[in-house]
Swiss-Prot record:
Gene Ontology CC: cytosol; mitochondrion
Annotated binding of FAD, by residue: 23-28
Role of this protein: Involved in the 5-carboxymethylaminomethyl modification (mnm(5)s(2)U34) of the wobble uridine base in mitochondrial tRNAs.
UniProt-recorded name of the protein: Protein MTO1 homolog, mitochondrial
Organism: Caenorhabditis elegans
Gene: mtcu-2
Length: 638
């Protein structure tokens, strides 16, 4: 009897495969689902179908900047937000006091439940097949991808390929001074694909990351840690989720603790037996290992959070304690922390080094510049984190489908979304360290908020066939209600004296008695609630969520007006391309330092050039003058 994989291979020869996605991680799942959703016959190739949707490191989604990405993936009808809302066990939003613009949606996730829900979603997606196996070679003819060759020599022809191999390219795991080839504990690395990239002239780099040990829950004395309660009013990730599936009482707390002098002593005494310390490969700046923390701040105490890995899981994840020491040293370190004196380790922490492709070799659609029809997404592009991977995955999947169907690709500008900021930073400036999304990277973060991600991106996704009819119906209804309420509240105007007669809570307000204000002004200035608005409009059918969105829009309205001119300027700069063969050394009036930085960064457009550290306004003026009246460019002849 034929195996499912063999039967699928035979079907692949008889029917067209529009898109092949290599890798079943967060980028791969989003990419495969998006391509299929857009109407392309899609095959997801993975070494093991049982690891699809695996949360390789932390049991959480979201955070500052990252929560914005999840909302934007959801606005493009991606999967991860909805799956998180079906598997979250603790909601703890960050930055609530700093305002809606930088609110960090975050939740602890049940690993097992998330993976099960994701696999169910992938398996039920129309036009999407799963194939188990390892890809040995990318088949390219005349600069265009035409298929893949599997390790068993089977060839599958296709129009487009999306590569989402995560940390598996020529990957090596290490603990202490011991190293061995693997992309994840117990899973082999993908070496042949790296060779295929090099064969086709791609520039590869090397990065590293790590993961903490997993601890046995029943060996921990939680009473010595500070209990951190979940949010009483959790905020869902998806616009389609009205209420989260788990009650406040059933959510699990996290626990806060700190390292101490003894941890510092043990760590510093064992640094000489740590491969990571000896290695020159760059590690994540914003998710450092304990070794990196001790090297930079040898005398400081560092925070750690104990996080549950699932509702019924016996394991605890120590957030902030990524370790690559040998296992016995990890045990010694952990047992020096109060509450962990008797801790047992289920799985020691480890580090992993892997190849990545310089993302400056990509277009803004995430298609490679060297090979037509080849798209890259996720950690292969130098990023770190589930959310960054998912964001790239949904864009790559939409654009691979568009390419396969000879339709225009979708680009998100940095003025439209954090996805645009992410992709623009990668493709324009590249990266020499694992890239993490931060709100500080976005120039228009007061506009690029989690609450309005659907308003910003869902119509764009619909134009590229990425939005289901169900989501579109919900979105158009929401947008219509918001526009209607905005218009009604803007048109209803009267003096503050009259408003005080209608809304009792305004009676104590002494200012602006003679000033004419609209109901829209009052909502965000005086934080009116649903009952207040009902008094204004004599309407009891106003939804709490629509009112909250209206308040936020009002809060940032003046800033939006001020930003319009700047947004237009950045859009113009982004559209001003800098040719690949531009010779910056011929530009008169530019300092040698700026020339060297421009030569090294090779920005793709004027907007990217302005973001290079050390590039002066004078240098930008010279560059703009050159782009209008270009001097002779550097010869590309060999």
């Amino acid at each position: 009897m034929l195996s499912k994989s063999t039967r699928l291979l035979r079907r692949c020869f008889q029917t067209d495969v529009d898109v092949i996605v290599i890798g079943g991680g967060h980028a791969g799942c989003e990419s495969a689902a998006a391509a299929a959703r857009c109407g392309s016959n899609t095959v997801l190739v993975t070494q093991n179908k049982n690891t699809i949707g695996e949360m390789s490191c932390n049991p959480s989604f979201g955070g500052i900047g990252k929560g914005h990405l999840i909302r934007e993936v959801d606005a493009l009808d991606g999967l991860c937000a909805r799956i998180c809302d079906k598997s979250a066990i603790t909601y703890q939003a960050l930055n609530r006091a700093q305002g809606p613009a930088v609110l960090g949606l975050r939740a602890q996730i049940d690993r097992k439940l998330y993976k099960t829900q994701m696999q169910n979603e992938i398996n039920s997606t129309k036009r999407l097949e799963i194939l188990e196996g390892e890809v040995a070679e990318l088949l390219v003819e005349n600069g265009k991808i035409v298929g893949i060759r599997m390790m068993n020599e089977t060839v599958i022809r296709t129009k487009c390929v999306v590569i989402t191999t995560g940390t598996f390219l020529r990957a090596q795991i290490y603990q202490g001074m011991k190293t061995w080839p693997a992309g994840r504990i117990g899973e082999k690395s993908s070496d042949r694909l790296s060779e295929s990239f090099l064969k086709h002239g791609f520039e590869l780099g090397r990065l590293r990351t790590g993961t903490p040990p997993r601890l046995m829950k029943d060996s921990i004395n939680f009473s010595k840690f500070e209990r951190v309660a979940p949010d009483r009013t959790p905020i869902p990730f998806s616009f389609l989720t009205k209420n989260v599936w788990i009650s406040y009482e059933d959510q699990l707390p996290t626990y806060l603790g700190h390292t101490n002098d003894e941890v510092c002593r043990i760590g510093n005494e064992n640094m000489h037996e740590n491969y990571q310390v000896a290695s020159e490969t760059t590690s994540p700046r914003y998710c450092p290992s304990l070794e990196s923390k001790l090297l930079r701040f040898p005398k400081l105490h560092h925070r750690l959070f104990l996080e549950h890995e699932g509702l019924d899981s016996p394991h605890i994840y120590p957030q902030g304690m990524s370790l690559t020491f040998k296992p016995e040293v990890q045990t010694q370190l952990l047992r020096a922390i109060p509450g962990l004196e008797n801790v047992e380790i289920f799985q020691p922490g480890y580090g992993v080094q892997y190849d990545f492709v310089n993302p400056k070799q990509l277009k803004r659609t995430l298609e490679t510049r060297k090979v037509e029809g080849m798209f890259l997404a996720g950690q292969i592009n130098g990023t770190t984190g589930y959310e960054e991977a998912a964001a790239q995955g949904v864009v790559a999947g939409i654009n691979a489908s568009a390419r396969a169907q000879n339709e225009p690709g979708m680009e998100v500008s940095r003025t439209e979304g954090y996805i645009g900021v992410l992709i623009d930073d990668l493709t324009s400036l590249g990266t020499n360290e694992p890239y993490r999304m931060l709100t500080s990277r976005a120039e228009f973060r007061l506009y690029l908020r989690p609450d309005n991600a659907d308003i910003r991106l869902t119509e764009l996704g619909r134009r590229h066939n990425a939005i289901s009819d169900n989501r579109w119906a919900i979105f158009t209804e929401t947008k219509g209600e918001l526009n209607n309420l905005t218009q009604r509240t803007e048109e209803m105007k009267m003096s503050m004296v009259k408003w005080k007669r209608i809304i009792p809570k305004l009676a104590a307000t002494s200012r602006n008695d003679g000033k004419v204000l609209s109901a829209f002004d009052l909502i965000h200035r005086y934080d009116l609630d649903k009952s207040d608005l009902e008094l204004c409009l004599k309407d009891k059918n106003i939804g709490e969520d629509i009112l909250e969105r209206l308040k936020i829009e009002g809060r940032y309205q003046m800033e939006h007006e001020r930003m319009k001119a700047k947004k237009q300027e950045i859009d113009r700069e982004s559209a001003t391309a800098i040719p690949d063969n531009t010779d910056f050394s011929t530009m008169r009036g530019m300092s040698l330092e700026c020339i060297e930085k421009l030569e090294r960064a090779r920005p793709r457009n004027l907007a990217a050039a302005t973001r290079i550290s050390g590039i002066t306004p004078e240098a930008i003026v010279v560059l703009m003058r050159h782009l209008k009246n270009p001097a002779p460019v550097r010869s590309s002849a060999v």
